[in-house]
């Protein structure tokens, strides 16, 4: 057997080429994680702002729902019939008034940096609905029914002269609905 009495070469302690490539790759991955984390944080903030918009609407509707059947309720566009059965208040007139002349007029859809829009449905195929707000009319079914309520979107020509059960929904970035509140109006 041939033995070589030479000692192995001493290592310098410096990274070789493969080590350097690995460290560069690791640094790039770290930068990508921080960058994507920042993007996801901003998107989460947009969603939280949209939820706050929905909560502002829910708070206004809840407060107004306790007083709107009184004769001197303002705004008249959102007043209930009270004693007047001929009152023609509609949901569309109420929403239009609130978007133009109430404290809710300044709400902004942060996904698009535009004025908040009331939409009929959250649509996954139409991403312009992201951050929009939707209102559903919850109609209770008779006791003992398998389904406790029927959910219909509130349309502009729906009458609001009586009490309504309303669900406030906002749309997330992907067009999925997020329930914010259910209230009596």
Predicted regions span which residues?
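Generic cytosolic/nucleocytoplasmic N-terminal low-complexity/intrinsically disordered segments
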Residues: 1-3, 52, 99, 104
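Catalytic toxin/effector domains delivered as secreted proteins or via bacterial secretion systems
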Residues: 50, 54-57, 64-67, 71, ...
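Intrinsic disorder/low-complexity segments enriched in polar/charged and small flexible residues
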Residues: 37, 59-62, 93, 137
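N-terminal Lys/Arg-rich, disordered targeting/topogenic segments
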Residues: 1-12
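Amphipathic alpha-helical segments typified by the pilin-like N-terminal helix
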Residues: 11-60
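Extracellular/periplasmic head regions of type IV pilus-like filament subunits
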Residues: 69-185
């Amino acid at each position: 057997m041939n033995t070589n009495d030479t000692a192995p070469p001493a290592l310098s302690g410096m990274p070789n080429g493969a080590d350097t490539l690995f460290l560069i790759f690791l640094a790039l991955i770290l930068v990508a994680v921080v960058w994507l984390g920042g993007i996801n944080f901003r998107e989460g903030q947009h969603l939280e702002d949209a939820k706050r918009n929905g909560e502002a609407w829910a708070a206004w509707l809840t407060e107004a729902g306790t007083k709107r059947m009184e004769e001197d309720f303002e705004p008249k566009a959102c007043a209930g019939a009270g004693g007047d059965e001929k009152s023609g208040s509609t949901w569309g007139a109420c929403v239009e008034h609130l978007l133009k002349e109430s404290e809710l007029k300044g709400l902004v859809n942060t996904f698009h940096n535009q004025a908040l829009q009331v939409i009929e449905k959250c649509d996954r195929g139409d991403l312009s609905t992201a951050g929009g707000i939707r209102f559903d009319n919850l109609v209770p079914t008779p006791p003992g029914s398998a389904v406790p309520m029927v959910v219909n979107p509130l349309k502009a020509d729906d009458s609001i002269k009586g009490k309504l059960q309303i669900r406030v929904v906002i749309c997330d970035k992907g067009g999925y609905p997020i329930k914010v509140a259910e209230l009596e109006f």
